[in-house]
């Protein structure tokens, strides 16, 4: 009798699980959609040279995205719903981890809630809100499949939630609707290998007040930095693409012997 009851309950849970996940995705999207933005980088001719995603962490326009999204930018604009916000400058630059915090000219913006990756568990459900391939604010879901150590004190998150070009800088949420990661890298040569930087890297940086003007920030081409090639080499290694990993590491050494 107990076995029958257990099987019945287990079957009911299996039937309900997809509906529960869909409900979570719908709730998370509705709660956070307005706090996820499109980030567009422009050159000195005012032509767009890069586009990615970002998320708002302060009502006055502090926005987190990837450094590579704004590579070589002379001007940056943020599309938040039907508003286009001009970026005044940068509050924080972390080239090593491919993270930047922008400061847009804004007030009373909706914000996301930040979680703690130290409390995350492998296998837990995650949701990514981003703008892949220019499709504004779409949501995808998957699991947190790994927390990897690139080097001493550097961690990355491996997720199965589908992401595409344009998703970089997007928010990775847990089931509680808290951001635990920043969608950062896709290994296109390997199926379902997507990586995110832990949100803990920026939690103590979002209160920064000093704005660095774009012209003084020294924004360079991320692909011309050793940090880019070192990180790429690590990701290739995780994907089993050892030849590509070696070449990436060699390039990192060429740039920074």
Q: What does each model-identified segment do?
A:
Residues 23-30, 39, 73, 88, ...:
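C-terminal cap/linker of serine protease catalytic domains
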Residues 45-48, 58-130, 134-138, 152-156, ...:
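Conserved active-site neighborhood of the chymotrypsin/trypsin-like protease fold
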Residues 55-56, 144, 163-183:
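Catalytic nucleophile loop of clan PA
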Residues 251-254:
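Conserved structural position within tetratricopeptide repeats
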């Amino acid at each position: 009798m107990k076995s029958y009851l257990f099987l019945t309950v287990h079957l009911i849970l299996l039937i309900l699980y997809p509906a529960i996940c869909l409900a979570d995705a719908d709730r998370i999207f509705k709660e956070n959609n307005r706090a996820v933005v499109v980030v567009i980088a422009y050159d000195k001719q005012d032509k767009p040279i890069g586009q990615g995603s970002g998320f708002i962490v302060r009502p006055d326009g502090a926005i987190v995205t990837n450094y590579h999204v704004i590579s070589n930018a002379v001007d940056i604009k943020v599309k938040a719903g039907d508003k286009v916000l001009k970026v005044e400058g940068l509050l924080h630059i972390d080239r090593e981890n491919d993270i930047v915090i922008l400061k847009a000219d804004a007030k009373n913006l909706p914000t996301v809630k930040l979680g703690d990756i130290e409390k995350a568990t492998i296998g837990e459900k995650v949701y990514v809100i981003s703008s892949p391939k220019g499709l504004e604010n779409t949501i995808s879901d998957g699991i947190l499949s790994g927390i990897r150590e690139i080097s001493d004190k550097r961690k990355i998150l491996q997720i199965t939630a589908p992401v595409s070009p344009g998703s970089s800088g997007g928010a990775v949420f847990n089931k509680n609707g808290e951001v635990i990661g920043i969608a950062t890298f896709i290994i296109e040569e390997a199926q379902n290998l997507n990586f995110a930087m832990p949100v803990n890297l920026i939690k103590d940086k979002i209160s920064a007040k000093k704005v660095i003007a774009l012209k003084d920030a020294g924004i360079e081409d991320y692909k011309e930095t050793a940090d880019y090639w070192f990180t790429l080499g690590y990701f290739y290694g995780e994907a089993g693409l050892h030849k590509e990993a070696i070449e990436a590491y060699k390039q990192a050494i060429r740039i920074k012997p």
